[in-house]
Amino acid sequence: MIQLDPTLLLSWRAGQHPDAPMHNDQRYMTGFGNEFASEAVADTLPVGQNSPQRVAHGLYAEQLSGTAFTAPRGENRRSWLYRMRPAAVHGTFSLIEQSQFHNDFGHGPVPPDQLRWSPLPLPQTPTDFIDGLYTMAGNGSPEAMNGVAVHLYAANASMQDRFFYNADGELLLVPQLGRLRVHTELGMLELEPQQIGVIPRGVRFRVELRDGTARGYVCENFGGLLHLPDLGPIGSNGLANPRDFETPCAAFEQREGRFELVAKFQGHLWRADIGHSPLDVVAWHGNYAPYRYDLRRFNTIGSISFDHPDPSIFTVLTSPSDTHGTANMDFAIFPPRWLVAQHTFRPPWFHRNVASEFMGLVHGVYDAKADGFAPGGASLHNCMSGHGPDAATFDKASQADLSRPDVITETMAFMFETRAVLRPTAQALHAPHRQGDYQQCWAGLRKAFQAPPAS
């Protein structure tokens, strides 16, 4: 049974009676990377220290570190958890043979082809979130602590007596179909399509499906923690604003029984028996915690004169690399917006990129592709692979009346852009839902060049 009572936190702070009614939005604390404090039972958090000799209510104090102890203060991430049992209490791990969810990106040749897939089919047998993960591509490694893995998920069952944590990286969840209720050690995230959630490395959780079936995308970030991009001359506001990020208030389960703890460690899945729910954190404080963000709140920036700016203006979150100005991974979106540029080809232009681009579509239609790119589908354009609008989109935009704005509605596309080449997995290359004729979308782009008469 979930015991979720953030009103106790409010009463502790504001003298409000714990039984006072509250709205759903009070189950979250707002801000990005803030120093939060939350307790599901009043008077649990120690005052003025982290690790008292005896924690209130017979709990244990445990620190969860997401960065090195000596990381600069502005980049340091850690939280103190006050829980019923330490995280060390579980059985011995044994290896799980799992063929779909892994970090095996191969060592052979990577085709330079543009790649596209139809939506991952929904399962026909009971499949929970973990069993429904399907690895598409990746680079780097958990060992080196750089790079990413890109996965899809398709599930039709909730995780009941099963819990998961990822020691290899933080997880960026992008639901496309169906709502998720993610129960974590630090509280509960409710996610729906057009929202995203981030689960930090090491945080234990289970996923409940609210609508029976679910599908979406996952970016597993092995590198530097995701943070907001610098705004430069945009100024102090814009893009994803910090106040719109939400971190859950403390909540806990108090269950004992025969449960399974699944860990992802060094690219493999492991399982251990555990005799209690590990979601037993009664209170916590710190800045290393899950969070969610509603993509519909993104403050889109664009040109109001001419030309189409670089897609970096659509960045929601970025994972830094060791090269200044070059990300390990950028998460960008292409949301509803107005296009008003004059003397300009308004859709995204033709492009070859030193970075590699994995795209997905959460909702609607992507404005650079008239057909073939469906919600739940995906595309991969690796380093220097030419890409851009299909022939139908090019013809339409080339003849458009620019005295009228293009009002793009009913869309939400996104991109994981990575510094290193994304190596597609064997299962992705040979998947029955891969569109083998993807290149044909550019076949209609005919030569129209006419040299002017010689003078």
Curated annotation (Swiss-Prot):
Cite the entry's keywords alphabetically.
Dioxygenase, Iron, Metal-binding, Oxidoreductase, Phenylalanine catabolism, Tyrosine catabolism
Quote the EC number. 1.13.11.5
Annotated metabolic or biological route of this protein = Amino-acid degradation; L-phenylalanine degradation; acetoacetate and fumarate from L-phenylalanine: step 4/6
User: Does the keyword Metal-binding belong to this entry?
Assistant: yes
The source organism is Xanthomonas campestris pv. campestris (strain 8004)
Matching SUPFAM superfamilies: RmlC-like cupins
Q: Which cofactor does it need?
A: Fe cation
Q: Which residues bind Fe cation?
A: H351, E357, H387
Name the InterPro entries on file. HgmA_C, HgmA_N, Homogentis_dOase, Homogentis_dOase_bac, RmlC-like_jellyroll, RmlC_Cupin_sf
Q: What is this protein called?
A: Homogentisate 1,2-dioxygenase
The record's function comment reads: Involved in the catabolism of homogentisate (2,5-dihydroxyphenylacetate or 2,5-OH-PhAc), a central intermediate in the degradation of phenylalanine and tyrosine. Catalyzes the oxidative ring cleavage of the aromatic ring of homogentisate to yield maleylacetoacetate.
Could you name the Gene Ontology cellular component terms for this entry? cytoplasm
**Location of the active site:** H308 (proton acceptor)
The UniProt gene name for this protein comes to hmgA
Sorted alphabetically, the Gene Ontology BP terms of this entry are:
L-phenylalanine catabolic process; tyrosine catabolic process
